[in-house]
Design a protein with these regions (language model features):
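N-terminal leader/auxiliary helical segments
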Residues: 1-266
């Protein structure tokens, strides 16, 4: 899932547990597995390929919020919590995003034939799940706006950079074995890149098409190709809206609670 969905779910979980007055840096720990990939030398395999734990490390208690992110992604990608990261790609995964993305696969394959840039079934399956992730926070946008999630996330980034950077870099450095200078660079870039205006600019279908096209280098000027991608996103959005919109989030929160995850008491 994308960073806004992760942030919104954490807001809901903490609200349901009546946990208040937490410092805002917890939301940046929660998006760290995605945020760190801003750095050219850090990829999602590195940020997601760590052993899962529910216990709270005494010296690095905020790392439990990184784990919350990874547990949610496990359920979205694999359909269950994985004690160890699953390196082998499975296009038939029973994770929420892959199940929901499966009806898009054939259309993705056909679209790439239009620009004579054919891709494999496995690659199409991977891209289909990303479309689901990219559209999901648009499906729950009303709920996101009701909790002012965008403003919260932007405020949290700036708060962490100004007030909690040393602690954050130390924790992330321990968890991922990365240079603290790299973490500091990520946070500096995040403050410049993740502004309220920039985030709001991509909170629509067109913004998500740009994200998708940029990620995969799809620069085709073929209008039929563009309309095909747009149709995929609309199809995905309509499919998700047929369900109870937050069902996956409710189920994920319960599964993670049953697993034993809980925020540190401060």
């Amino acid at each position: 899932m994308l960073m806004l969905t992760h942030t919104y779910l954490l807001q809901k979980v903490l609200g349901a547990a009546d946990i208040k007055n937490q410092d805002l840096d917890i939301y940046i720990y929660n998006i760290a597995p995605d945020l760190l990939t801003i750095h050219p030398n850090i990829n999602s395999d590195k940020t997601h390929n760590i052993k899962r734990f529910a216990e709270i490390p005494v010296k690095y208690p905020q790392s439990v919020y990184v784990m919350f992110h990874l547990l949610v992604d496990d359920l979205a990608h694999f359909g269950s919590i994985c004690l160890d990261y699953q390196e082998a790609f499975n296009p038939e995964s029973q994770g929420f995003c892959y199940i929901k993305g499966k009806p898009l696969i054939k259309s993705i394959l056909d679209l790439h034939k239009i620009i004579q840039n054919e891709i494999s079934y496995n690659e199409a399956a991977y891209r289909s799940h990303l479309i689901i992730e990219m559209i999901y926070d648009l499906v729950i946008l009303k709920e996101i706006n009701s909790l002012k999630t965008i403003s919260l996330l932007v405020e949290a980034i700036n708060f962490t950079f100004k007030n909690k950077l040393a602690e954050f870099t130390s924790t992330i450095g321990w968890l991922y074995d990365v240079q603290e200078s790299d973490v500091q660079a990520v946070m500096k870039d995040a403050c410049a890149y993740l502004t309220k205006e920039r985030v709001e600019r991509i909170m629509n279908i067109e913004g998500r098409i740009r994200l998708y096209s940029d990620k995969f280098g799809l620069k085709s000027k073929d209008n039929l190709f563009y309309e095909g991608i747009k149709k995929l996103f609309i199809q995905a959005k309509n499919s998700l809206e047929l369900d109870e919109k937050e069902l996956f989030l409710h189920q994920a929160a319960k599964t993670i609670k049953d697993y034993g995850w809980m925020p540190p008491i401060t």
